[in-house]
From Swiss-Prot:
Belongs to the universal ribosomal protein uL6 family. It holds the Pfam family Ribosomal_L6. GO terms for molecular function: rRNA binding; structural constituent of ribosome. Disulfide bonds: none annotated. This is Large ribosomal subunit protein uL6. Signal peptide: none annotated. NCBIfam families: L6_bact (TIGR03654). It comes from Synechococcus sp. (strain RCC307). The lineage of its organism: Bacteria, Bacillati, Cyanobacteriota, Cyanophyceae, Synechococcales. The gene is rplF.
Amino acid sequence: MSRIGKNPVPIPEKVSVEISGLTVKVKGPKGELERVLPDGVSVSQADNAVTVSPSDTSRRSRERHGLCRTLVANMVEGVSKGFSKKLEIIGVGYRAQVKGKKLVVSAGYSHPVEMDAPEGVTFAVENNTLVTVSGADKELVGNEAAKVRGIRPPEPYKGKGIKYQGERILRKAGKTGKK
């Protein structure tokens, strides 16, 4: 039995949860999310809380118990508060800007790299070097932030590239010349 899965997910005000079988729909001020949970768990709602429990004692359902509880908790938090990830762009001439729903990144290539924001995700840029990816779906926000970082990952010698805010880059010493 999962320790995380035992805790019920509290539902804040202005958030509504609909459960039909293994499909969970969550609506709130930041948007609406829907997810189909895997087999082996049962979901119920009572007293402004959602409870996830394993449907049987098999290993697979016990493994998925904590996962499903966390997925529901992230959906509730996403539609009430939202999620965001910040990325720093480091390097001479490296910059970003938003054009409509597109993020345009100049990262040392011969052409600027354009990224479309998927449904439910927004890009914001401060000072041309700080990109904020925000939205209600934690998984989608994390994937889009990883795609932005993947345009030019930080390199270990000078630290140039796109990194998450607060990420530590392992630095290496350069070659030592002949003496």
